[in-house]
Amino acid sequence: MPVSLAVCETANVVNAALRESLGGGGGSGCVAAAAASGRSGSGSSSTAAAAASADEAKIGDPSATDNLQSQIVANAKRVLLAKIEYEEVENYHESVLAKLKSKYIVIKPDNSGAANCSYKTNGASTGKALSSNGHDNTNGVNGSSAATVNGNRKQTVEQSNQNSTTNPNELPKPKRVLYPRENIRIGWKQSDRKWQVGAGMLNVGNTCYLNSTLQALFHIPALANWLVSETAHVENCNISESCGSGGCIICAMAKTLQTTQSNQTAVRPFLIYTKLRQICKHMVVGRQEDAHEFLRFLVEAMEKAYLMRFRNYKELDQLVKETTPLSQIFGGYLRSEVRCLSCNHVSITFQHFQDLLLDIRKADTLEEAFDGYFSRERLEDMGYKCEGCKKKVSATKQFSLERAPITLCIQLKRFSMMGNKLTKQISFKPRIDLSRFAARSPAASTQPLSYRLVSMVTHLGVSQHCGHYTAIGLTESGSYYNFDDSYVRPIAMQSVCNTNAYIMFYELDVASSSINSSSSCSTSVPKLNGLRLNGQHSPSVATTAVAATATSTSASAVSPRFIGPQLPNGYANNNGHVLGAAKTSIQFKSSPQKQPQQQQHNGLLMGANKFQESAQSKHSLVGSLHKGETAANASANAISNANSNKSSCNNNTLTTNSQHQQQHILPISSDEEDEDEDSDDDVDVKANTAPQLPSMPKMFEDAESVAQTAKLKPKTPLKSLVPYESASEEEQEQQQQQQQLLVSPQLQPANPRKRRSGADSSESEDEPPSIMRNGHAKSNGSGNESSTSTSIKSNNNKQKTDAIDEIFKSLNNYKNKHRATAAGTTTADADEDEQQQQQVTKKPSNSSSSLISKNGWQSQNGKAPASPKTPPSPAVIKSKTGIWQITRTDDDNDDDDEDADEEDDADADAEQEEYDDEVVVVETTPSITTKNLNNPFASKPSSADAMPGAKRQKLLNGSAKSAQTPRVGNGYQSEATANGNAVSELLKQTHRGYGTSVLSWTGKTSDLDKQSFDLVCAKRIAGYGDMDGSVGVSSDSNINNSKNIDSNSNIKSLTAPTLLAEAREQRKRDAEDDEENEMDRGRQRKVKSASVKSNNGIPGYNPFQEFESQKRWNGNKSGSFPRFYQNYRQNFQQRNKFKYNRFGGGGAKFQQQRALQRHLAAGGGFTRRQHQSTGHQQQQQQQQS
């Protein structure tokens, strides 16, 4: 009887097995063996001794039984080093050891005896054998084993020819399957429940990566169906004890999915958020993380939670662990072939993957990235050790798909190790075919690999450390939705394909795969690279496919295998491929589908995008399939979603099919059904005039107005989408159409704007144009004429008079406009009168003034120059104090311009170009109050006269200033300004909001409030200004007297050319500071240089800082005048406190003065101690000079 025992650490079981086997050999031997094992320290030693005694007893030596103990003691060393060979017993006490099979291996010795130390391996064995020293010897691939004989370790290699059925070139099969691949339900229709769009998720603090990843996972049909099927586990989950109070991550995912499906408002995924440290230890709550990193840790945590359901999950091999539901859904196998360039030896290995990381640095499309990933690459020279050559050689390596996953996860490598982001646009399609990348095996070559985009994760930002994550998911209705934290909105197919995707999830398209698999006349259940379609979930798929194959007819006897977009059943393309003549009428009572809208141009069918959108990708927002309908309709619906192939599909057939599909999916009655069946063959090609929900806001209104620059406000409460980096092609087309309308409005057709496609259209009614393109309301009129009537006339109208007459004419025009704006009446022509009245009446009551710009502002979307006949509408700026309208002023208001000479005057043209962009402010108050030009808020006119010898100096705001006497001081104290300190002026302006004219710190007006150029010239000629360009402060009487200026006054002959030359120089200086002349809308002003606008003689003077300094240093009674220096920094004395006494030795006072001079030359200020010692000396020196 062969020895049969179970390997165990305890010696009792071993001794019992030995006694049972050696029962017939002699009781003394058994007793001796038991005694020896009782005194032995280890079970293995007693086993070896008992086996040796048993062998001697079988030989028949009579002294062996009597002297068994003495022989064991004498040969203790040989017994300890001896090895016993065993082999597995298949049916040994199966009823007894049934519960112990997972812990014990049943073995038996070899008949050749213990003398032969080499043993043969069994192909069905587990590859483990127990040696005499208690260690396991693991068999290799070819059956190599390590045997120990007489203390020497000897390696013997022997190949097994009996059961060697494993092929190294084929994927090994796991010994145990934890979750069958056939149980995975693909597609939303495979589930018994109704799937909603899903609620949004609240951002609880930098959790956009978590929300977007969960939304993308929840919109994968295979994963969602599996999570819903885990209800029994969720109810009886006992993993919470081992995982702590957090519980199972699979249960948390299932509960979160149920919450998003049942709630209508945004939910808070606290079940996942609280397990963040359980998912990944280094992730911190509230910190920004990478979405792909979180995805990998989340899937790994779910796999670990599933393996914990099995008691011996730690002892499972890697192949068994790769049969979990998560691995069956996301997992696949890559075949790596390394070919030696010397001996052409090919080494094949298999690699399990759950996502593909594609390099996009050299790719512009997703197909190019796939080609680069699966292309043959050359390993570095002499860097691969070939198994055939046994040396390092050059080789090539290539990947291929051995087993394609059910859900393909693709990550685009957009981030570098330094955190920088590659923001290039990668174009992709909602359907991809990976058949050309499959391994060339008989099972994989005949089956297509068609995938459909189900969800994706996008990243908005410029680097890995900042930005925002959003998700896009495909719902059961076939529409894509954008999930931006708590905001959920539908998104068009064009926007989806133009998104800078980061992570994409593609799922196997069962419908198209079943169509192609049925074309091979196989009546069995189709398989997809080892994936068997679920017959129990969709039994009508195979039946419909077989019936379609039986009734199909082809032009050729043997049609080649066709990979790519297919037409629905009953329609053939121009190549003769008939996918099925069976007529299937899909009638959805509450889920009408939408076909992609085709644009007709000259009888040709043109796609609105690079590819035609699938029929199933356009579904209704609220429609759904009733569960009472047959599965045949559902399968036929899945079959009918095919793209149009522009190389082999007839355009007219496509359009007819599109209309036919639309008629059958809309709700119809029985009479209408009969009529549709009679008119199947002759369906008129017409546009889709009834777009269904979901709808997006329309870009333009279906109105017949000409050159309308207003964008309608949509009635749908949906907010605008997150702006992506590239606009879609449809948006570019609409922008081009808008540009054409602006350039040539007289050639506009009756209906210039086409309605967008179904998911991009809106059902809102036409509204009057009341919203400008910049988002602000119009204030100058309700119609198109009012929007363009206030704009400037063509700049080609030249000045017809000489320079002197033009100056006075401009002054008269300024006075006429000022009077007309205030009183509501004007003395100009009727057109100008109507324009001025519209500007006054359309203004709201809270607006105090209107900005009038000569150059005008173009609209935000204006890319082409406007037509001279139809200038663009003026820009409108909305502020707290009202609505500001930027319009243009007319310089030729009088009728005298039309009767003037037609010759162009060069000086007048130059002058016109110089102040063409002048900006003036016109008050619209009922009464006119002449104010001080330097300080309009002053109650009394300023009495300060202009200094005759002052030079003109241009500041940042472009205003002129009067020169002042240079002062010497400590840098902290200053006299008050002529019109009061800076704080009092600021207090007077506290009621004014953003967008209004704001005075400078010194009380002077900004560029938007300064006087017009013609008034300045008129004042200079009238004698109220200096000839060198400086302008004094004029009082109210001076301004009133300037109205009665006689044009025939005595003026020097060189006055006009001098003024024009100065005006040209001044306008050139003003043009360089256009950035500083812009209106303050609440943004921070940009200062080009370090100098600040001031009223003092030093460029770095700041009156507001001076006022603050007076409160701190008012105790200084030195009586010195303040003096500020450029680049003065606050608290500079703290840094340079001991700078004056850093020089030692003789001549300390001279060194101190030299250091002070260098300090002042560098732009620093006085320190406190230097001020006390040197203030009076500098004052005296300057007074003497």
Swiss-Prot record:
PROSITE patterns cross-referenced by the UniProt entry: USP_1 (PS00972), USP_2 (PS00973), USP_3 (PS50235)
Assigned GO CC terms: cytosol; nucleolus
Residues with PTM Phosphoserine: 552, 554, 726, 728, 867, 873
GO biological process: germ-line stem cell population maintenance; heterochromatin formation; negative regulation of antimicrobial peptide production; negative regulation of innate immune response; negative regulation of macroautophagy; negative regulation of peptidoglycan recognition protein signaling pathway; positive regulation of proteasomal protein catabolic process; protein deubiquitination
Enzyme superclass (EC): hydrolase
Modified residues annotated as Phosphothreonine in this record: 716, 870, 925
A single GO molecular function term of this UniProt record: cysteine-type deubiquitinase activity
Biased composition (Acidic residues): 670-683, 891-920
One Pfam family per UniProt: UCH
Active site: 208 (nucleophile), 468 (proton acceptor)
Annotated localization: Nucleus, Nucleolus
UniProt region (Disordered), positions on chain: 126-174, 642-804, 818-975, 1056-1122, 1136-1185
Keyword Protease: yes
Listed Basic and acidic residues bias regions: 1062-1071
Ranges annotated as biased composition (Low complexity): 642-658, 778-797, 836-853, 1151-1161, 1172-1185
Protein origin, superkingdom: Eukaryota
Keyword terms of this UniProt record: Hydrolase, Nucleus, Phosphoprotein, Protease, Thiol protease, Ubl conjugation pathway
Catalyzed reaction equations: Thiol-dependent hydrolysis of ester, thioester, amide, peptide and isopeptide bonds formed by the C-terminal Gly of ubiquitin (a 76-residue protein attached to proteins as an intracellular targeting signal)
Entry EC no(s): 3.4.19.12
Subunit structure: Interacts with atms/PAF1, but not with CycT.
Protein family: Belongs to the peptidase C19 family.
Protein purpose: Required for maintaining multiple types of adult stem cells, including male and female germline, epithelial follicle cell and intestinal stem cells. May function as a transcriptional repressor by continually deubiquiting histone H2B at the promoters of genes critical for cellular differentiation, thereby preventing histone H3 'Lys-4' trimethylation (H3K4). Controls selective autophagy activation by ubiquitinated proteins.
Protein name (Swiss-Prot/TrEMBL): Ubiquitin carboxyl-terminal hydrolase 36
Name of encoding gene: Usp36
